[in-house]
Swiss-Prot record:
SUPFAM superfamilies: Alanine racemase C-terminal domain-like, PLP-binding barrel. The modification N6-(pyridoxal phosphate)lysine is found at K33. This is Alanine racemase. Pathway: Amino-acid biosynthesis; D-alanine biosynthesis; D-alanine from L-alanine: step 1/1. It comes from the Bacteria. GO terms for molecular function: alanine racemase activity; pyridoxal phosphate binding. Coiled coil: none annotated. It comes from Salinispora arenicola (strain CNS-205).
Length: 372
């Protein structure tokens, strides 16, 4: 018996990946960073591979090594690498590494020497996000250093990549500008004498809306889990996560009763209150106070009063509600329950954050569609 749970439909992940894979001639990297966007990195990775993913993408070296320890042999790219990490462990495990500066490249050269095999690198160019990646002015120097290291046998340049700013806003001119910069960067790669097998730029949004940005490899993340990166468009994706809890306690209160800390909510009539054992320690944003949608007893309700660390309250009015009844915070939406998109809109964030925070807390995570 569970008090609260996050339930993940692995068949939904398989279905989403299969559909995404069928829509492009490019190979597909399923991004499973952030504990698989809260869905569980290893189960999500295995389901994505079942669905046809060719690659897995993660941020950290630890994430990549965890996948290897779990017996996953598919190609893995890790790209958020601070100085001083034991990169030789990644090289020895056959993990591809993202490089965005000569300093990073130098560390990877040393890692290749220590591991006794070339470090497989994906060189990243900053096409406009101003985050990771070499600037356009630094790009030629990185290419020159990479070409020399490859000639020395300490690295192998496997890929060249970048990341979009506005792909979730189809038609935004920045996307076209970034694509042009990426093409210019690829021309420089060729002039430097490098011939990487993979050129990749497309995130979920570009995978869905910009086939001209698919190149050799696409990198969907959010879409793998059935959520759309483009507002107002579902693309037929199937959400994989449901968050729910059982009613812990019900009580009758009179009209005018203040509810939860600060009494920011007051009952307008005699009402039944339902106490739900989930709070901000479990991923419920405190900003969901008086705004978060919850489905209980066949009715979509709104959190009444402030979200506490471990619980929140619903004003159920005259509706019959009892301890043990199931309150669904979000799911696929097929049965009238809110979705992660509804939650994102209610609290002023994005669906990425909703599933990642709910799935990475003390709430037990369970799975449908597990395979031996």
């Amino acid at each position: 018996m569970w008090q609260a749970e996050v339930r993940v439909d692995l068949d939904a992940i398989r279905e989403n990946v299969s559909w995404l894979r069928s829509g492009s001639a490019a190979e597909l990297m399923a991004v499973v960073k952030g504990d698989g966007y809260g869905h569980g990195m290893v189960p999500a990775a295995l389901a994505a591979l079942d669905g046809g993913a060719d690659w897995l993408g993660v941020c950290t070296l630890d994430e990549a090594l965890t996948l290897r320890r779990e017996g996953i042999t598919a190609p893995i790219l890790a790209w958020l690498l601070a100085p001083g990490l034991p990169l030789h462990e990644g090289v020895a495990a056959g993990i591809d590494l993202g490089a965005a500066s000569v300093a990073q490249l130098d560390e990877m050269v040393q890692a290749g020497r220590t591991a006794g095999r070339p470090a497989r690198l994906h060189l990243k160019i900053d096409t406009g996000l101003s985050r990771g990646g070499a600037t356009v002015s630094d790009w030629p120097g990185l290419l020159t250093a990479a070409a020399k290291a490859q000639a020395d046998g300490t690295v192998e340049v496997v890929g060249v990549w970048s990341h979009f700013v506005y792909a979730d806003a189809p038609g935004h001119p920045t996307t076209d500008r970034q694509l042009a910069v990426f093409h210019e960067g690829l021309d420089m790669v060729e002039k430097a004498g490098l011939r990487p097998r993979y050129r990749h730029l497309a995130n979920s949004a570009a995978t869905l809306t910009r086939p001209d940005a698919h190149f050799d490899l696409v990198r969907p993340g959010l879409a793998v889990y059935g959520l759309s990166p483009v507002a107002g468009e579902s693309f037929g994706l199937r959400p994989a996560m449901t968050a729910r809890a059982r009613v812990m306690l019900t009580k009758q209160v009179p009209a005018g009763a203040g509810v939860s800390y600060g009494h920011t909510y007051t009952t307008e009539r005699d009402s039944t209150l339902a106490v739900i054992p989930l709070g901000y320690a479990d991923g419920v944003p405190r900003s969901a106070s008086n705004s978060g949608p919850v489905h209980l007893g066949g009715v979509r309700r709104t959190i009444s009063g402030r979200v506490c660390m471990d619980q929140f309250v619903l004003d159920c009015g005259d509706d019959p509600v009892a301890p043990g009844d199931v309150a669904v915070l979000f799911g696929s939406g097929r049965n009238g329950e809110p979705t992660a998109d509804d939650w994102a809109e209610a609290v002023g964030t994005i669906n990425y954050e909703i599933v990642t925070r709910f799935g990475s807390t003390r709430v037990p995570r369970s799975y449908d569609g597990e395979r031996p």
